[in-house]
């Protein structure tokens, strides 16, 4: 397993990580109690709960989000994938439903959060997973919620887009829903001694999750930038030509990566 970098920043940064870990636990207690008391049963209610949770967490941890364009109100949203923080950012911007790999269900913290929010988990290679994805997407759209997924299938260090997988994209196209591209990236607005976006914000490879989260919580001035395409992707390929459709989708996200106009929210 790839080792995390030595804890940098000294005692002050370490104590900040401890404090924000306690604060994060308090958020889970607060919103967990709300979940138990209100018992949201519909997809819309659960998505609204996740939206409030994530928006509150970003404010509480002083994470700034800048956007260009608008979150699509319906259909599917696809984006590059850098970190567990991506999930929090997109959910904070708009109520939505995620389609994600089954392993995410067992992630500490985020696994519980996304499960309670009605995430559609997909076990690749298992029989019936494609049908489950398609029916889950359709149910979300029928409830008036956009569906979010990351076609790279895993996180990266952000140097370049990984090849897009075609499975979930084919299921989205098979329902006839529009698919809109987005691009997310991170930067620091304040100095963080020895920290880098690649090692301390992006979560990729075989980095151990809990040590990474602890270090992440000690950072200051994290700034997320999200760009949304102006309109859904005009696919030439259909669900039956899913590999070609995946390349078209990747090109749409890459186009956003190459642009640089943002508005702080």
Indicate where each model-derived feature is located.
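C-terminal/domain-terminus segments
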Residues: 236-260
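Generic beta-sheet signal
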Residues: 101, 122, 150, 182-184
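A transmembrane-helix-recognition feature enriched in membrane-embedded lipid enzymes
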Residues: 2-67, 112-117
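A cross-family acyltransferase "interaction/gating" segment
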Residues: 110-111, 159-240
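Soluble extracytoplasmic domains of inner/organellar membrane proteins
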Residues: 130, 137-138, 145-147, 151-164, ...
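Residue-level preference for the first positions of well-ordered beta-strands
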Residues: 74-76, 119, 144-150, 178
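Catalytic core of membrane glycerolipid acyltransferases/transacylases, capturing the structured
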Residues: 27-40, 59-60, 73-128
